[in-house]
């Protein structure tokens, strides 16, 4: 199953013009809100911590094995005549990364559905950003609105849950997984006759078997769709038939 490195901003000194918090604060709220969606969609993740930096996040990701690197930021116009006047969302990707470009375009198309100025949601190639240039897997750095613009800052603050769902939906699309809404995690017990319960990479009998859960073992259910549960069992994630799990 897919595994991503999730890197919300660690820039606590970038204050929102509203005074409600910082870039670090709101991007970590966004990452918090994404976690249930990622688990429900069998996307495993490692996440940086606020005391880290972009450089240490990149280094931590380099020590692991990931299918994607996602950095969450909000933007600023900088000093000068445009300060506080710019708006929009930018999905940055590395120019020669086909999958980075594909992911950026998926994020853009989905974010256009919830951002009030869809024409200002764009994808852009760059070699200047470390979190785009240095990760080994395909990567995207999202600049989600301008925190020095009042309208953008308020939009972010009021739409953390909507943005989290939207980004998670984009990740599911990128990994060719059906999007599943999260449920309150529940412990389930495998109730096969004797055999272990197959765990599949996709919620269909044609889905690849990626592991199994022993008879009478307990697993955690995160979501459900059409007779399947999305679940976790130790380090194993995937989909199991719901009739073989007692909640």
Language-model features: where?
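Catalytic cores of processing enzymes, dominated by hydrolases/peptidases
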Residues: 57, 95-146, 184-187
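Solvent-exposed loop/turn segments at secondary-structure junctions
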Residues: 11-13, 51-54, 74-80, 96-99, ...
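Short alpha-helix capping/helix-loop boundary micro-motifs
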Residues: 203-208
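Active-site-adjacent mobile loop/cap segments within catalytic or ligand-binding domains
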Residues: 4-16, 64, 71-74, 78, ...
């Amino acid at each position: 199953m897919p595994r991503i490195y999730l890197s919300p901003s660690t820039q606590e000194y970038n204050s929102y013009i509203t005074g409600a918090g910082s870039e670090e604060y709101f991007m970590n709220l966004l990452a918090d809100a994404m976690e249930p969606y990622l688990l429900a969609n069998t996307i495993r993740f490692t996440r940086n911590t606020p005391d880290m930096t972009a450089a240490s996040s990149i280094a931590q990701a380099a020590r692991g094995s990931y299918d994607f690197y996602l950095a969450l930021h909000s933007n600023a116009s900088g000093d000068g005549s445009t300060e506080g006047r710019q708006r929009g969302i930018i999905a940055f990707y590395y120019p020669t990364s086909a999958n980075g470009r594909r992911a950026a375009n998926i994020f853009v198309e989905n974010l256009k559905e919830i951002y009030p100025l869809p024409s200002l949601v764009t994808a852009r190639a760059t070699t200047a950003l470390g979190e785009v240039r240095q990760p080994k897997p395909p990567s995207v750095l999202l600049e989600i609105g301008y925190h020095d613009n009042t309208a953008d800052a308020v939009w972010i603050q009021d739409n953390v849950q909507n943005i989290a769902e939207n980004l998670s939906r984009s990740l599911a699309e990128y990994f060719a997984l059906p999007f599943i809404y999260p449920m309150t995690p529940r412990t389930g017990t495998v109730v096969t006759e004797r055999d272990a319960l197959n765990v599949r990479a996709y919620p269909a009998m044609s889905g690849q078997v990626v592991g199994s859960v022993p008879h009478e073992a307990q697993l955690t259910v995160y979501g459900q769709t059409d007779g399947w549960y999305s679940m976790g069992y130790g380090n194993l994630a995937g989909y199991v038939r719901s009739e073989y799990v007692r909640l």
